[in-house]
Amino acid sequence: MTTDTTSLAARSAAFLDYLDGYTQNLQPATLDGLIASAGGPEGVAMVVVDLVGGFCTEGALATPRLGKLVGPVGDLYDAGWAAGVRRYAVMRDAHHANAPEFAAFGPHCVAGSGEDTLEPELARRPWAVDALDVSKNNLSAFAEDG
């Protein structure tokens, strides 16, 4: 068995250089411009991921840094709604009591605890009422529940 003694930093250098170049070359965008480039509001979907109590306001993993995003995200999504966007999805951490993820992060956002619900400031907005609601018991909403 061969052991790779190369440090993580050394193995990651090429990717980090790429990422640095990518972020430095990003161009500003407007919501209207993005909607237009999608062929109109029918070609746009807006997705909220994990802006739930357990990460924003209460619980072991809540952080004021994430909580400060609630208002600006809500305002952006309201602007999308005003521009005619009607496809919204809300992806929420909502773990079973024995979620494997708890081994790494400790219990958080347990289904039914209140920590798993969309922040109230967002939940009462028009776009949130009919949004596709996706609860997830995994880091990714696209991975098998587990």
Language-model features and meaning:
Residues 2-134:
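Active-site acidic carboxylates
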Residues 133-146:
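Glycine-rich phosphate- or other oxyanion-binding loops that anchor nucleotides, phosphorylated ligands
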